[in-house]
């Protein structure tokens, strides 16, 4: 099952459901909006995560050409969905748009997500 992310249109909070019970997510007194990840990238700045697995280590890099990591335009986080759960790494301007995750024995990658402060949610 794909992860689902929701964003508050007032304060910008973003949540991901661990277990969706059917109750709508709300924030600031209103229902949150589901963020549908993009999967194709035609812009000059690449957003689609690139996933490389080496044994139990998974490296996720944002873009086949590295995404900028400036104050005004950067990747805020990278999330890895696996068969056994998910992991998230926060990023900051000035860092490389890359995160390394460790898989538990027998676990496998399902999807990788990243969130750009200007262009939203992306998935590979």
PLM-predicted stretches and their roles:
Residues 15, 31-32, 120:
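Cys/His-rich microdomains that often coordinate metals
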Residues 17-21, 35-38, 124:
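Short Cys/His-rich "knuckle" micro-motifs
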Residues 115-124:
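Short acidic/polar inter-strand loop motif in beta-rich domains
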């Amino acid at each position: 099952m794909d992860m689902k992310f929701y964003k508050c249109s007032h304060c910008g909070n973003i949540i991901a459901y661990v277990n969706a019970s059917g109750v709508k997510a709300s924030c600031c007194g209103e229902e949150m909006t589901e963020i549908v990840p993009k999967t194709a990238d035609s812009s000059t700045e690449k957003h689609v995560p690139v996933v490389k697995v080496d044994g139990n280590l998974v490296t996720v890099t944002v873009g086949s050409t590295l995404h900028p990591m400036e104050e005004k335009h950067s990747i805020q986080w990278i999330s890895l969905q696996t068969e056994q759960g998910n992991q998230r790494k926060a990023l900051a301007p000035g860092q490389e748009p890359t995160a390394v995750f460790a898989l538990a024995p027998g676990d496998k990658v399902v999807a990788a997500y990243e969130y750009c402060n200007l262009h939203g949610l992306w998935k590979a």
